[in-house]
Amino acid sequence: MDDRMIDGELQDQDVEIELSLRPSTLSQYIGQDKVKENLTIFIQAAKMREEPLDHVLLYGPPGLGKTTLASIISYEMGVQFRSTSGPAIERAGDLAAILSSLEPGDVLFIDEVHRLPRSVEEVLYAAMEDFFIDIVIGTGPSARSVRIDLPPFTLVGATTRAGLLSAPLRDRFGVLSRLEYYEIKDLCNIVERTADIFNMPISSEAAIEVARRSRGTPRIANRLLKRVRDISQVKGEEEISLESTKQALEMLQVDDAGLDHVDHKLLTGIIEGFSGGPVGLDTIAATIGEESQTIEEVYEPFLLQLGFIQRTPRGRVITSKAYDHLGIKRTGED
């Protein structure tokens, strides 16, 4: 799958900009008010007891700030931040090397925690619960188990697919926080903050337009703003205007609802090929030339959020809201 401008997953182009824009404290973090409120209390209580924070699971769609929140937790606790990902930890020995290097109270962030190999996950159970790991050294009759004691630490796991976590792993997290898609007003604040960091003021109307087409996702808002800034600077504007914003977003084929050409292809494919459904996921995938998993994990969540598509026992169905947005009449309508 090619990188999409409105894909919430982290892309190479995002890494540098996200590091420069990342807030360091909960007070600087915009949105997710309930999650922030809870974390503030939990962090304060842990610091009062002089204990590490309970293990934290952050879950929700990509691009909503899970990695940022993990780094903020370490900053607020006054400890070091270590970061890795589930696919990067292939063996129990890889995990042992990371855990044994932690200092007391450190935050270990594991992105895509649902992708940890089962053998690694089983080693993690004791590390999270009792702060030790057992490592088998050698093979055959001479093999022996060695116990390594670990300093108390906080594991922050992040996942876009909480349903794939095993129950034993999920139950070892003391704090579970779901990140939701952002409201327009919060995205506007993020866009204005980013524009300020870029030293390129933006009009309130332009900020609203970027926010409205960002699929409720800060990462997408910042990515779109970079391209809007390009147009505005080429035109010699001192402030990003609504006109330049609309021009840039039209060039990027991002419509008023935040849908791009791939979303349109998926929706119109079901409408034109299958009368709006119901139609099975594998059939849709074959029709538009994408993998079923990609459709289910990347394209569908926002379309479901908008109410443009429904999942039914018989397959996917396009809703009347989607027909109205696309300007297509249902078969049989006058």
From Swiss-Prot:
CDD domains: AAA (cd00009). It is an enzyme of class 3 (hydrolase). Keywords: ATP-binding, Cytoplasm, DNA damage, DNA recombination, DNA repair, DNA-binding, Hydrolase, Nucleotide-binding. One of its GO terms (cellular component) is cytoplasm. One of its GO terms (biological process) is DNA recombination. It comes from the Bacteria. One of its GO terms (molecular function) is four-way junction helicase activity. Disulfide bonds: none annotated. Coiled coil: none annotated. It catalyses: ATP + H2O = ADP + phosphate + H(+). Mg(2+) binds at residue 67. InterPro entries: AAA+_ATPase, AAA_lid_4, DNA_helicase_Holl-junc_RuvB, P-loop_NTPase, RuvB-like_N, RuvB_C, WH-like_DNA-bd_sf, WH_DNA-bd_sf. ATP binds at residues 21-22, 63, 66-68, 129-131, 172, 182, 219. DNA binds at residues 311, 316. Residues 1-182 are annotated as: Large ATPase domain (RuvB-L). Residues 256-334 are annotated as: Head domain (RuvB-H). Residues 183-253 are annotated as: Small ATPAse domain (RuvB-S). Transmembrane segments: none annotated. Its EC number is 3.6.4.-. Pfam families: AAA_lid_4 (PF17864), RuvB_C (PF05491), RuvB_N (PF05496). It is found in: Cytoplasm. Has 3 domains, the large (RuvB-L) and small ATPase (RuvB-S) domains and the C-terminal head (RuvB-H) domain. The head domain binds DNA, while the ATPase domains jointly bind ATP, ADP or are empty depending on the state of the subunit in the translocation cycle. During a single DNA translocation step the structure of each domain remains the same, but their relative positions change. Homohexamer. Forms an RuvA(8)-RuvB(12)-Holliday junction (HJ) complex. HJ DNA is sandwiched between 2 RuvA tetramers; dsDNA enters through RuvA and exits via RuvB. An RuvB hexamer assembles on each DNA strand where it exits the tetramer. Each RuvB hexamer is contacted by two RuvA subunits (via domain III) on 2 adjacent RuvB subunits; this complex drives branch migration. In the full resolvosome a probable DNA-RuvA(4)-RuvB(12)-RuvC(2) complex forms which resolves the HJ. Belongs to the RuvB family. The RuvA-RuvB-RuvC complex processes Holliday junction (HJ) DNA during genetic recombination and DNA repair, while the RuvA-RuvB complex plays an important role in the rescue of blocked DNA replication forks via replication fork reversal (RFR). RuvA specifically binds to HJ cruciform DNA, conferring on it an open structure. The RuvB hexamer acts as an ATP-dependent pump, pulling dsDNA into and through the RuvAB complex. RuvB forms 2 homohexamers on either side of HJ DNA bound by 1 or 2 RuvA tetramers; 4 subunits per hexamer contact DNA at a time. This is Holliday junction branch migration complex subunit RuvB. The lineage of its organism: Bacteria, Bacillati, Bacillota, Bacilli, Bacillales. The gene is ruvB.
